[in-house]
Amino acid sequence: MIGCHCHTDRSNIRLLDSTNSVKELLKTAVKMEYKGLAITDHEVLSAHLDAIRTVREMKKKGDMPEDFKLILGNEAYLVDSLEEVRDNYKSGVTKFPHFLMLAMDPKGHEQLRILSSQAWENSFYTGTMERVPTVKKDVEELLSKDPGHIIATTACLGSEVNIHLLKIKAFEETGDSQSIKQHKLKIHEFITWCIEVFGKDKFFIELQPALSEEQIYCNKKLIDIANGYDLQMIVTTDAHYLRPEDRAIHQAFLNAKDGEREVDSFYEACFVQNVDEIHERMDYIDKEVIDQAIKNTMLIGEMIEDYTIEHEPIIPKMELPNFKLRHLFKPAYDQYEYIKKMSESADEQDRYLLKLIEDGFEEKLKTSELTREAFHKILNRINVELGELWEISQKLNQSMSSYYITVREIINIIWDDECGGDSLVGAARGSAAGYLVNYLLDNTQINPMQYDLPHWRHIHKSRPDLPDIDIDTEGSKRQKILKALRERFGDKRVLQIATFGTEGSKSALQTACRGLGIDNDISQYLSGMIPFERGSNWPLKHCFYGDKETGRKPIKEFIREVEQYPNLKETALKIEGLTNKRSSHAAGVIIFNDEYTKSNAMMKTPKGAYITQFNMGDSEAMGSVKFDLLTIEALDKIRVTLDQLIENNEIEWQGSLKETYNKYIHPDVIEYEDDKLWEMAGNGEIMDLFQFSTEVGHQSVVKVKPKNLLEAAVTNSLMRLMSDGEEQPVDTYVKYKNNLNKWYEEMTRYGLSEKEIRVMERHLKDIYGVADTQEVVMQMVMDKDIANFDIKESNYLRKSIAKKKEDVLKEVEELFFKKGKEIGTSDNLLNYVWNVQFKRQFGYSFSLLHTLAYSIIALQELNLNYRYNPLYWNTACLTVNSGGIDTEDTKDNKKTAATNYGKVASAIGNIRQRGIKIDLPDINKADFGFRTDINNNSILFGLKGMNGIGDDVIHHIVLNRPYSDFNDFIERMFKSGIIKKGQVIQLIKGGCFDSFGNRQEIMKAFISLISEPKSKLTLSNLKMLIENNIVPSEFAQEVRFFRFKDYISKKVYKTLKSPKDKLFLLDDVSASFYNQHFSEDSVVDMLNGQLVISEKAFKKEYDNKMSNIKSWITTEEPLKKLNDCLLIKEWEKYADGSLGKWEMDSLSYYYNDHELSGVNFAKYDIADFYKLPAEPVKGKPYQWRGKTLYEYETTRIIGTVLDRDKNKHAITLLTPTGVVTVKQWSGSFSHYNKQISRSIGGGKKEVIEKSWYTRGTLLMFTGFRRGNNFIPKVYKDSIYNHTVCRIDFVDNEGSMSLTTKRAEI
């Protein structure tokens, strides 16, 4: 049997559907003794290449029979008319029938790609459901041109034929013969259409072995249809999970998206069933019929070719302009073989590349100033690089030149500020920086010969691969760049690359919790305990079982917490790694020579962006060549700075963006040497310095205090390396930089001879004896005095040491020592090189070409701060961090990035520490983003940086300016409905109206406006008066009567219609009060000894008793008191707290005093973090596992939470003296970070206590300082009992009201 209808987790990209990975599905098929399997995901082909590779690997390992047949298909949604289902959609009525198509050969697969791309082109939403219909007419037109390449089947209960059969079933029960006749006609039309389009021998009726009443009915009718039209039948299981034991996990996975979804019965039979299970489930049908249907699946297999959709890479070719090669290098042609070959090449792409090289040579290298020696050195480098291109082109049988020409064209489009991307382009990224040809073409901006960068890291004939030139751009211009590329090359030739999101460890645990009905607060708490290391969370397997290779131990606390919830562990482990969504790759773009369906297929992201159906690796394997257009915020910040400088006449616009950039900050024109420039870096003065803005980066650049570009690049590399010992590589570098003799002492300790030390000097002296990059490692092993590796071997070593896999490392280590000993290298030198210099890069290794290029971008930022007032740069950083720049700058579509409030708040805190003033946002002056005020040496806060305002409101505020006073603003903006109450309050809190008067008085005026005071009172307002303690004591009895009436009104026994009345049943307590204060006139009955009274009769007596208080209520006194109370409540709701609290709520920083500046620091032993020793002070010793350790002296700090990093378990705290990072261990962080709620029924819950790490929370931490971090810690015998306390209130004496424990339910 062949499973002709099976789903993988790629079916999950629109709606959670399947828990089958490709590999496990195929393994299960083999286990169930299938002879083949079809991949038929829901309108997506993405799993096909993965399946091809998996089958190949399994056959190679002997895990799958050689004759196992893989079939590639698609389950489409086949409709009669797009307009009908889209424009006339009716929920529950409009159907999108399922339909199965299987490709018989490569042509059939191309047809699937075309149809699937058309379906995605047709896509639209009905509510939150994304529809991707395939129109019958499109199928007809396509297959009529070249029929016979696709097999079709009727699919599942959701198919057109089964939809009509189930309608017939319903009408049979009601006896509606006319409707039955109509649906039979529809079935006939559908069947005959399928026969006409696909052919009778390529269209099959599909039966399925589900036990539902509907499936049994349809199966019987489908047999009749097959016999009536002389069609073949097949049996499929529509596998969405692997085996019955996976059913509960599949149910939990699907329910995680929609808890109300009924999935268990619907998918009851949707697993990989063996033949016996199929027979057992279909025992109501003749065995011979089922046997033949099973046999027919093999018939389908015989009709399908064995083929692959893989293809050699197809390099895009640009249409070239008319050009003439000037033969600038002709006098040296005979000396430089490959320059001559390119000049005489039959391929015009080669000749055009050489023409561009000639242009760049004259423009960039100032040929008139070159000596003969320098001239030939450059020509030799060009010749070597062209030689690599030429030889690889011969091996690939296509011109590599076209790749470089295409990259140049893309970069020109990106630079174009008139009809292109209007974006800066980064100096270089990665290995492309090592190629002189790239520099001459303007593909990079760095002359590699100036820095002795090796060309062979980019491409080399020993590894005939395509080059990979990554391009950095402004993040805010990405959509504009993509639009410009589509306009240049055509919509059908440009696609962004797809990426498929998977269930990581955190999301898998959270998904499992949702599916199993475990509260979200618990889910967040548990997932917060998963460690985060080197940019990613631990896999769940490592959390539960540990991992020997990485040295990770099981997390006992995590295991203990998870195991409290049945099936959570098993479900989460199974879900982890499953595909759950689609999106566009952050960088990858493919430019096709032909329409994309020739080698790929198109789909859309949920936001409508056009992307490939295959991920990057698969797309490349199918022949596509990708171009990585990456985005870095540094370029956005540089661009905003340049725009400000132009606006303030500090620099002049040069007619284009590129020419302006070239004049002022191109790497060829910036300052490299000035000591003051490097002091700014070493002192940590530059905000968000590229590559050094993280905590580690900032610490490293301050430690190293680089004096030149090379030292900055080394710092950039070494700060990423980690040592097993206490001294980290960057610390070793600093030590040797300050005293190079210590490096020589190290080499002497390892027994190196004078000659061997000279060898080390050759490679390491310029970088103070610390091998920092891949290139240094490769050059050392290629040294004839060390190991004499060739390029291929050194490249293998580079890749191997970066993986930190014991078996791979051992293999390359043996090769290194073997080759070294063969050429006579001493054990001492080999040991020193391997165990000291190389060891630092085990597990992680960085490239010099990348760090140097990126350090140049940092240097450009330094230049902007050095040459111009740093206010411009600081303002640009705040603007970009706040999302205050357009992310899509097209005529019809303006968007802005989300504000990173925590990052903005931290940056403002750090800026103010350096004495820079941040002015409050003035309603008539503040821009969308932050703005430099050079005259006042300050930065004006940008409206985008405010909490709770919103882009649209900001645009309206700016559009309607100026405002003459606060009332003018209210009349035109608030009363007109443009701006909401909460947004006005945020503007007031943030000081936007301070120019109009006192902030608190303006707030009072607005609160008075919105508090809606009562104009008069009646007895119906008595409850409100009582709640606010306004009723005088003289009316105490009336208050009791009111509460009595309120109480019995909830005890309705019976409602009478005629005469209209309600009867109240009094309990013992209320009956006693009634008998004491009211007459029997209202009593109408007794029920089991309890009084029953009439509401109508009671009300007369009640109103009479309430007459005095009723008169009082209508007087001025209670009205004034109640309105005063309402005003106070509105104030407490919206405007409680100090000005500092207002500013934190609105701006996330304190313009005035910190909320905690009045705390009695001495009373609570609170320290200024910045005056604490940088390293913890040792205190009392103690023994732990045979070692002597020390307690550290602890103290306290206080501050306001600005931000939290759930991965790094860190809190950004604004203390009264500056911003501090507090770092906790995962369990403690999760404990204080979790939200605590309780169920209140009806699927709802109320929050008992928010996370303590919510922005704006005031906290006190106990612990010690380590470097730039504060580490919470208390000891058993310490005077402090808690690492974290929440500060609830500070009184006038500086005493704090503290909460020391989390709330309990």
Curated annotation (Swiss-Prot):
The EC number(s) this enzyme carries: 2.7.7.7
One Pfam family named in its UniProt record: PHP
Reaction catalysed by this enzyme: DNA(n) + a 2'-deoxyribonucleoside 5'-triphosphate = DNA(n+1) + diphosphate
Tagged with keyword Acetylation: no
Domain of life: Viruses
Molecular function terms from GO: 3'-5' exonuclease activity; DNA binding; DNA-directed DNA polymerase activity
Alphabetical GO biological process terms: DNA replication; viral DNA genome replication
Coiled coil: none
Key word Zinc present: no
UniProt keywords, alphabetically: DNA replication, DNA-binding, DNA-directed DNA polymerase, Nucleotidyltransferase, Transferase, Viral DNA replication
Role summary: Replicates viral genomic DNA.
Family per similarity comment: Belongs to the DNA polymerase type-C family.
Entry-linked NCBIfam families: polc
Protein name: DNA-directed DNA polymerase
